[in-house]
Amino acid sequence: MAKLCAQQVSVVYASRRGALTALENVSMSVGSGEIVVALGASGCGKSTLLSLLAGFQPPTSGRVSVDGVPVAGPGADRGVVFQDDALMPWLNVIENVAFGLRMQGVGRDARHARARDVLRLVKLAGFEQHRIDEISGGMRQRVGLARALAADPSFLLMDEPLGALDALTREHMQTLLLDVWRATGKGVFLITHSVEEAVLLATELLILSPRPGRIVARHALDFARRYAHGEPVRSIKSDPRFTEIHLALVEQLMRETEEV
């Protein structure tokens, strides 16, 4: 089973006011078939942690590794999905999805075949030739997800991928993410500001403190696995235990913020 690990990582930035610690001694891991969700106030280091896992920046101290091999930069084993889909408007849907494969030297027929496969997975079959300005925000985010999946990474790293969507589209996308996770068995690291979303999607939930970001709580949750075994989202969300956990986490986050 593939495993992406951060071990005792800290990130310190220089500023005019002196050293600023964004993350302090954070250890966590994401394995195949897991959804690890990071939740915390703005500025607590969630995106910095994702940046370390993606290889976009090195930690000031500590270590990031995949299966014991140090991460030295971005890699095809880690697909990244951002809140801003960052699609290329001069390319159509299938060319956006296949772009990374094109950069890897994969031939046109092979990369388009793979792109069609992942477009079917994210329920966008039939939209291959559409321009980016012809599709909705939710569809654009699905194109971004398909692009991340095209290289068949072991891990998906997702930085508030649903944050800019309206409430109904967001609910549909939550279900789609669970469907993709169930179908692929990939390890997922996801950042969100939505407590409800975190409770639904996480197999492990990490609570980060306000700056400097530290993991102050870890919660093992089973709602995503219940969905994977066939229970509808509506049934899961109507479970009193779901509501109880949701409210307890809101209270915990409020306490963390008030203590700053």
UniProtKB/Swiss-Prot annotation:
Acetylation as UniProt keyword: no
EC number: 7.6.2.7
Topological category with respect to the lipid bilayer: Peripheral membrane protein
Main enzyme class: translocase
UniProt subcellular location: Cell inner membrane
Domain ABC transporter: 6-235
Designated gene of the protein: tauB
Substrates-to-products reaction catalysed: taurine(out) + ATP + H2O = taurine(in) + ADP + phosphate + H(+)
GO terms under cellular component: plasma membrane
Keyword ATP-binding: yes
Subunit organization: The complex is composed of two ATP-binding proteins (TauB), two transmembrane proteins (TauC) and a solute-binding protein (TauA).
Protein name: Taurine import ATP-binding protein TauB
A Pfam cross-reference name: ABC_tran
Keywords: ATP-binding, Cell inner membrane, Cell membrane, Membrane, Nucleotide-binding, Translocase, Transport
